[in-house]
């Protein structure tokens, strides 16, 4: 049988208390690939939310924010066609792939190939209208305000007053206009906006923990 909520809570809290105590011995996070003290605080904030200890959750979320050393991503950060959601420096904790990573060498079995619609390689992409696309539905899209820049990370329907807010990778802009359906994600960009070379474009980063989660 599964353990109780209380048992699991105590187990996780003990682990995180030890992490908070000993993580000072980790002097190199490998460019945020390994967690920092701020990440431990963030995990504790999540734990206390799960246990409905909201005062503690707030306390540790604030500690995470103060220790993070990063600010919430701006509109320019999020919509950049070269750095949009592929820059580990913007997050508290992430994974960084390089051209030497096994996942990148496969050409297709990697984050960008699965998540980025703006490539001509991988499982999603703009090679044709038959390709699968990561997207949201109209209901979710319509719930976002037209002044909320997060909405600009999804392709606006034809004739929309905010269509000009969508920023495409220039080398494949025509393909995006031709094949990409409305509400398709523009969020995760290939590295440096390289949409055609999998060895370069897939050498990207993806987030594990963001400071925005703490607000």
Segments predicted by a language model, with ranges:
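Aromatic-anchored glycine-rich loop motif in surface-exposed flexible loops
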Residues: 1-30
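Alpha-helical solenoid scaffolds that mediate protein-protein interactions
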Residues: 19, 26, 64, 70-72
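Elongated scaffold/linker segments in the mid-to-C-terminal portions of large proteins
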Residues: 70-215
């Amino acid at each position: 049988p599964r353990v109780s909520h209380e048992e699991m809570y105590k187990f996780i809290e003990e682990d995180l208390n030890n992490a908070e105590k000993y993580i000072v011995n980790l002097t190199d996070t490998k460019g945020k690939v390994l967690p920092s003290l701020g990440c431990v605080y963030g995990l504790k904030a999540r734990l206390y939310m799960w246990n409905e200890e909201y005062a503690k959750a707030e306390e540790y979320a604030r500690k995470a924010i103060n220790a993070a050393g990063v600010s919430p991503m701006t509109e320019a950060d999020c919509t950049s066609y070269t750095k949009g959601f592929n820059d580990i420096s913007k997050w508290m904790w992430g994974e960084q792939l390089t051209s030497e990573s096994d996942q990148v060498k496969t050409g297709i079995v990697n984050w960008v190939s699965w998540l980025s619609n703006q490539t001509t390689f991988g499982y999603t992409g703009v090679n044709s209208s038959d390709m699968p696309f990561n997207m949201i539905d109209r209901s979710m899209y319509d719930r976002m305000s037209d002044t909320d820049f997060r909405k600009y990370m999804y392709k606006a329907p034809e004739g929309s007053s905010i269509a000009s807010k969508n920023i495409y990778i220039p080398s494949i802009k025509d393909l995006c206009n031709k094949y990409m359906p409305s509400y398709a994600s523009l969020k995760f960009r290939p590295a440096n906006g390289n949409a055609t070379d999998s060895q370069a474009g897939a050498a990207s980063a993806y987030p594990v923990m963001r400071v925005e989660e703490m607000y």
